Swiss-Prot record:
NCBIfam families: PRK05738.1-3, PRK05738.2-4, PRK05738.3-2. This is Large ribosomal subunit protein uL23. PROSITE patterns: RIBOSOMAL_L23 (PS00050). It comes from the Bacteria.
């Protein structure tokens, strides 16, 4: 599936776990398109943020069951990617500058 670079990376994930990974080992977390491959994620991050990506790990987060009154629904599944950058590269979006 051919995805545009802007469609692959949906948003950054800013959680406590992601912050610890960023500080300890230069890993940044993103929510990505469900059909995106590791190669597409790598190319998109390199092009969007002008950095060098060493490794990409992906995981499918399962949607949770939610209730509103007596109606039960389900949130959709989504994919996240942990991207490891080359020594010295940073993404300013996460640094707050």
């Amino acid at each position: 599936m051919n995805l545009a670079v802007q469609d692959v990376v949906k948003r950054p994930l800013i959680t406590e776990k992601a912050e610890r990974a960023r500080e300890a080992s230069r890993q940044y977390a993103f929510e990505v398109h469900r059909d995106a491959t590791k190669i597409q994620v790598k190319q998109a991050v390199e092009k969007l943020f002008n950095v060098h990506v060493l490794d990409v790990r992906t995981a499918i987060a399962r949607g949770k069951n939610k209730r509103v009154g007596r109606n039960v629904g389900r949130r959709p599944n989504w994919k996240k990617a942990y991207v490891t950058l080359k020594e010295g590269d940073t993404i300013a979006l996460f640094e707050g500058t």
